C-alpha cells in the first residue's frame, strides 16, 4: 500500500491540486487511488481544520507513533472496502513542521510505501500574495497586523525546512520547481503516476 503525501510549500498551486483530486474521485478510483483530503480528521475529527492540524502536530512522539498506526489501519480498512492501493493526502501546512511530524512519518514508513511531494517557488513570486493571505485575511500571528517587512521575514523562514526534508526523506521525497510556466495539476499527476481528465474550466491554474 502506498501513501503519497503532498506537503506544499505554500503558494505553489496547492488549492488547484486539491480541487482536481477532490472532483475526480471516479477517475482516481479506476486507477485504485483514493484521495483522503487535506486533514488528518480520518484519525480523529478533532484534527480537522487549521487549528486541528496544529493539535495533531502538537502530539508527543509516542502519541504520533500510535496515531500513525491508527492511520495505517484506517487506510487498510478503506483499501479493503474500495480496492484502493494508493492514497493521497495534500496539506501545504505540513511543510514548515518537518520536525514535529517526523515520528508520525517514521512510523508510517514501517507500514506503507511513503512518497512525499513538495513544490518550491522563488519567494519573489509569492511573498506579496502570501502576506495578503496569511498576514491579513487568514492572520496567523497574534496581536496587531504586522508590516510587510516584518511579516515577510517570518514567511521566508519556511525555506529553512527544505534542506531538512531533503536530508531526512531524500529517498522518498520528490521536489519540483514551481513557476507559472507549468500546469501544476498536470505536473503533480505526472509526478504521482496518475491521470485525470482535463478540467471543465481552463481556469484551473497554479496560484
Residue ranges with predicted function:
Residues 35-40, 115-120, 199-207:
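A generic structural motif
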Residues 94-97:
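Short acidic, S/G/P-rich loop/turn micro-motifs used as interaction or catalytic elements
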Residues 9, 92, 178-179:
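Structured loops at beta-to-helix junctions and adjacent beta-edge loops in soluble globular domains
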Residues 82, 142, 202-204:
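Feature targets compositionally biased, intrinsically disordered low-complexity regions
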Residues 27, 99-200:
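PAPS-dependent sulfotransferase catalytic domain
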Amino acid at each position: 500500500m502506498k501513501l503519497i503525501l503532498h506537503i506544499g510549500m505554500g503558494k505553489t498551486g496547492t488549492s488547484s491540486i486539491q480541487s482536481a483530486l477532490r472532483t475526480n474521485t471516479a477517475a482516481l478510483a479506476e486507477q485504485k487511488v483514493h484521495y483522503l483530503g487535506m486533514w488528518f480528521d480520518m484519525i480523529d475529527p478533532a484534527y480537522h481544520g487549521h487549528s486541528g492540524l496544529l493539535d495533531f502536530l502538537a502530539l508527543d512522539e509516542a502519541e504520533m507513533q500510535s496515531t500513525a498506526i491508527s492511520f495505517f489501519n484506517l487506510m487498510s480498512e478503506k483499501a479493503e472496502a474500495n480496492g484502493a492501493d494508493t492514497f493521497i493526502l495534500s496539506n501545504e501546512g505540513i511543510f514548515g513542521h518537518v520536525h514535529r511530524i517526523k515520528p508520525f512519518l517514521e512510523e508510517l514508513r514501517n507500514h506503507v510505501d511513503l512518497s512525499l511531494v513538495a513544490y518550491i517557488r522563488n519567494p519573489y513570486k509569492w511573498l506579496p500574495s502570501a502576506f495578503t493571505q496569511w498576514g491579513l485575511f487568514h492572520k496567523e500571528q497574534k496581536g496587531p497586523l504586522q508590516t510587510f517587512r516584518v511579516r515577510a521575514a517570518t514567511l521566508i523562514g519556511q525555506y529553512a525546512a527544505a534542506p531538512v526534508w531533503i536530508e531526512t526523506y531524500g529517498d522518498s521525497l520528490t521536489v519540483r520547481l514551481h513557476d507559472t510556466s507549468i500546469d501544476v495539476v498536470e505536473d503533480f499527476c505526472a509526478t504521482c503516476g496518475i491521470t485525470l481528465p482535463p478540467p471543465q474550466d481552463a481556469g484551473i491554474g497554479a496560484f
